[in-house]
Amino acid sequence: MMLTIGAMTESFRRPFPEGVTMAADNRPSWDEYFMKMANDVATRTTCLRRGVGAVIVKDRRILATGYNGVPTGLTHCSETGCLREQLGVPSGQRHEICRGLHAEQNAIIQAARYGINIAGATIYVNTQPCVVCAKMLINAGIDEIVYQNPYPDELSQELLAESGILVREYTGE
């Protein structure tokens, strides 16, 4: 059996289909890359109100992901209906009246469950964290929050400002 090294090397050099190339300057920025991933993670939600995804990153490496949804093993809201809607609870109020967890909470829990240290990490989330998630991110040691869509929670913003966590709105590049 004869192995042709040149052909093998060429096949490894071409990660794209024939005729498709990607120049280094056309690659997405790290912010764009991780925010796209947060939006992709959000597609796993079974929440009937909002699709949120989060990606925790350190040194440009993904540590954990999370999306909003009920705890593992429980019936999804897409099957049971939205408790908050049934009770007439407005968005942004009474977070405890919900069967689900927020994306940031699930990402923190996944990291803890698998023994991953997220202190000093950055979280990319497609919606600005609520006050409950802000407090958890502060105590988890997150250094930076990059969010895409604003969320009107003044207390969250005040606590994050006081904590010294860098908070940036991602507006695309």
Give the ranges of each region predicted by the language model.
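Zinc-dependent deaminase catalytic domain
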Residues: M2-E173
